[in-house]
C-alpha cells in the first residue's frame, strides 16, 4: 500500500475511474444488445413501431459509443467498429423483412 499522500490519492482516483469506465462499457454493451434484440424482433415481425424503437435505440447506442470513445474508455477504432456492426445488423434485418414483405405481396397479389 502506498504511504505517500499523493500516491494514496492516485490509487483512489484510479479506482474511481475504473468503476466509471466499467459502468460505461456495461451501458454500451446493454444498448448494443437492445438494438440487436429489437432488430431480430423486427425481422421476425415487421411493424412500424418496432422500426421507430430500433432507430431510437440505435441513436442512443451511437451516442453512448461516441461518448465512450471521446472520453478514452473505448479506442476510436473500436467505437467505429461497434457502430459499423450495429448499422450492418440493422440494415440486414430491415432488408430481410422488406424482402419477405415483398414476397408476401407477390404471392397474394
From Swiss-Prot:
Database matches in SUPFAM superfamilies: Ribosomal protein S20
Keywords of this entry: Ribonucleoprotein, Ribosomal protein, RNA-binding, rRNA-binding
GO function term, MF aspect, one: structural constituent of ribosome
Pfam families membership: Ribosomal_S20p
GO biological process, one term: translation
GO cellular component entries: cytosol; small ribosomal subunit
Record bears the keyword Membrane: no
Ribosomal protein listed as a keyword: yes
NCBIfam families: S20
Family: Belongs to the bacterial ribosomal protein bS20 family.
UniProt function note: Binds directly to 16S ribosomal RNA.
PANTHER family from the UniProt entry: 30S RIBOSOMAL PROTEIN S20, SMALL RIBOSOMAL SUBUNIT PROTEIN BS20C
Protein's name in the database: Small ribosomal subunit protein bS20
UniProt organism field: Synechococcus sp. (strain JA-2-3B'a(2-13)) (Cyanobacteria bacterium Yellowstone B-Prime)
